[in-house]
Amino acid sequence: MKRVGAHVSIAGGVENAPLQASKIGAKAFALFTKNQRQWKSPELAALSIETFRRNCCDGGFRPEHILPHDSYLINLGSPEPDKLDRSRNAFFDEMQRVERLGLKMLNFHPGSHLNQIEPDACLQLIAESVNMALDRSCCVTAVIENTAGQGTNLGRSFDDLACIIDHVEDKSRVGVCLDTCHLFAGGYDIRTKEALDRTLDEFDRIVGIRYLKAMHLNDAKQPLGSRLDRHECIGKGAIGIEAFTAIMQHPLLDELPLILETPDSDGWQEEIGLLYRLAEEQVKDVSTPP
């Protein structure tokens, strides 16, 4: 079964996230566990945690289908010692919040070398940061998100992802979330079933398909290899509808959280419906009614 959802709002408290997901017909969801634009936030209240867990249960959302995302402020490969220390502490705090919610994964962007250190040194810092967080926590898997390769951000190539994983000591608690827009912008073609198969085969050869824990489903505003992270609605960008048909029909992607981060949140319910139709049959025109 495919588990499609979206990155939903936590306005009013994290306990509202599963309610928002249910409203749009999601079978998975992503969320921030705090204000992602602040380094520190109040601890999660016991009542919020209890209500979150109950709402997840009522909505049929299991921990393996929920993908928390850390703050965009965090840079686990920062070349600046004070910012690296702050990022590591914030990342561990996010791990603790995820554990308290009873969840199993924390999705994060690898990091940026800021043109101050060599990329290999930055990758080592990222792996070291992950090791430190895993050592101080007990059950959350650190899920690395591939990037578009914009600016000095690392994690565009499968080689980058493999390098980080190779240096993570507990291989049972590290994984990857593949973002389709980032893949495409980073030079990995997924526009047809054959192209998707080739890209997944390459991922398996270099990283290992066993590490694939989730996907972000986004079309792309920019062409293949642009290195620009510009999301578009499903079927309306440069990737196209055939790619998402192939994803929705690919058996290796069953039971993974498939999370929309497309720009029109008001259209998520419609996009989720479209994706589930794609799972059943070839749809050439995104305007085709159910």
Curated annotation (Swiss-Prot):
Any one Pfam family match given in the protein's UniProt record, by short name: AP_endonuc_2
InterPro entries hit by this protein: AP_endonuc_2, AP_endonuc_F2_Zn_BS, Xyl_isomerase-like_sf, Xyl_isomerase-like_TIM-brl
Highest taxon of the lineage: Bacteria
Coiled-coil regions, chain positions: none
Entry binding sites for Zn(2+) 3: H182, D229, H231
SMART domains linked: AP2Ec
Catalytic activity: Endonucleolytic cleavage to 5'-phosphooligonucleotide end-products
Residues given in the record as Zn(2+) 1 binding sites: H69, H109, E145
Free-text comment on the cofactor: Binds 3 Zn(2+) ions.
Function recorded in the entry: Endonuclease IV plays a role in DNA repair. It cleaves phosphodiester bonds at apurinic or apyrimidinic (AP) sites, generating a 3'-hydroxyl group and a 5'-terminal sugar phosphate.
Record-stated family: Belongs to the AP endonuclease 2 family.
Protein's recorded name: Probable endonuclease 4
Species whose genome carries this gene: Chlorobium limicola (strain DSM 245 / NBRC 103803 / 6330)
Gene name of this polypeptide: nfo
